Amino acid sequence: MTLDLQTTIENAWENRTNLSPVDATAEVREAVEQTIAALDLGRLRVAEKTEAGWIVHQWIKKAVLLSFRLQDNAIMGQAPMQFYDKVPLKFAEYGDTAFQHGGYRVVPPAVARRGAFIARNVVLMPSYVNIGAYVDEGTMVDTWATVGSCAQIGKNVHLSGGVGIGGVLEPLQANPTIIEDNCFIGARSEVVEGVVVEENSVLAMGVFLSQSTKIYDRATGKVTYGRVPSGSVVVPGSLPSEDGSHSLVCAVIVKRVDAQTRAKTSINDLLRA
């Protein structure tokens, strides 16, 4: 079934400029709908971690993009909280039974779009989770945090207030941004452009990471890009230019996570009971 969906999506993608709510075939509509529904339930995800590393299923991302060509805008919600959009809200039709089955908390006015997966014991404070995102068990998405389209958030992650996790839809990115298990992302930090923060890492308040951000390891003196090694403690910093005329923003790995760091950033099970 997945192979059939993929083939239909790939073929539709090649013809995407000709797609519209009027012109799309029933086969394409059904393939896109099934893919979005599977994303919503966590049966499919845009990226998966394997022994060889992260694998990105580009065809699923294409299905998300195609969904915008197949839907007309419609009014959703009720005054004074009315919206006009193509993507339904994830919880629009939920009743008490559906929320209990989901096993997560949604604090008003948190918003998740249909096609985002929210796992058990997740807490959504007043935040935003975009289509295609995957938020795994025990994670806290704190107030005014944003989980971008197709972003992958691991288990027991804390996204602090105002954190931004970048999406892939605009500007169009090849790979999703990934925050692995047991990470703590400090307030107002931004991780975008497909950067991977490996498991058990801690980003201090105000760390900004894109593919062009230098990541400086204080212990080794090495500079890398696009990936924070597992167990890193990262703070904002700057590095001087070669001629010493100016400095540019960077992220600095100051140490590896230790017991003291864990004590300061551990999650509170009482909030997930």
From Swiss-Prot:
Subcellular location: Cytoplasm
Presence of keyword Membrane: no
Primary localisation category: cytoplasm
A Pfam family of this chain: THDPS_N_2
GO biological process: diaminopimelate biosynthetic process; lysine biosynthetic process via diaminopimelate
Catalytic reactions on record: (S)-2,3,4,5-tetrahydrodipicolinate + succinyl-CoA + H2O = (S)-2-succinylamino-6-oxoheptanedioate + CoA
Keywords: Acyltransferase, Amino-acid biosynthesis, Cytoplasm, Diaminopimelate biosynthesis, Lysine biosynthesis, Repeat, Transferase
Keyword Transferase: yes
Top-level taxon in the UniProt lineage: Bacteria
Gene Ontology terms: cellular component: cytoplasm
Pathway(s) annotated for this protein in UniProt: Amino-acid biosynthesis; L-lysine biosynthesis via DAP pathway; LL-2,6-diaminopimelate from (S)-tetrahydrodipicolinate (succinylase route): step 1/3
Enzyme Commission number(s): 2.3.1.117
GO molecular function: 2,3,4,5-tetrahydropyridine-2,6-dicarboxylate N-succinyltransferase activity; nucleotidyltransferase activity
InterPro entries registered for this protein in UniProt: DapD_Trfase_Hexpep_rpt_fam, Hexapep, Hexapep_transf_CS, THP_succinylTrfase_dom1, THP_succinylTrfase_N_sf, Trimer_LpxA-like_sf
Enzyme class: transferase
Family per record: Belongs to the transferase hexapeptide repeat family.
Protein's UniProt name: 2,3,4,5-tetrahydropyridine-2,6-dicarboxylate N-succinyltransferase
Originating organism: Bordetella petrii (strain ATCC BAA-461 / DSM 12804 / CCUG 43448)
Recorded name of the encoding gene: dapD
